[in-house]
Amino acid sequence: MINPQPDEKELLKTILEPLLGDFEHWFSRSCQLLESQRLVFFTPEQQQELLDRVRQARDEVKCTKLMFQATGEQVGVEFSVLVPWHNLVTECWQVAQRHRQMQAAR
């Protein structure tokens, strides 16, 4: 059986929907960490600044996800929007890893 090429809507649903879900998940986890733990390798101001950026990105992702759903999954997202989210998730992973390492060293 030959698999036909997916149309744009199927492609968006297959790729964008889980990607937005992943961003939402990691930003929520990062908020939990930043809100519940005092990270000693940050000043309080640095931690708050990161938390503010994560909250803003989480809200942007939620809005994008709602727009995606409201348009019948027919709207895409510019790569220039996704890259900063990806970079922020990577930064959050590094912060979480550093936090775990410091916890393990205690």
Swiss-Prot record:
InterPro entries tied to this protein: DUF2605
Xref: Pfam families: DUF2605
Top-rank taxon, per record: Bacteria
Record-given protein name: Uncharacterized protein slr0270
Source organism of this protein record: Synechocystis sp. (strain ATCC 27184 / PCC 6803 / Kazusa)
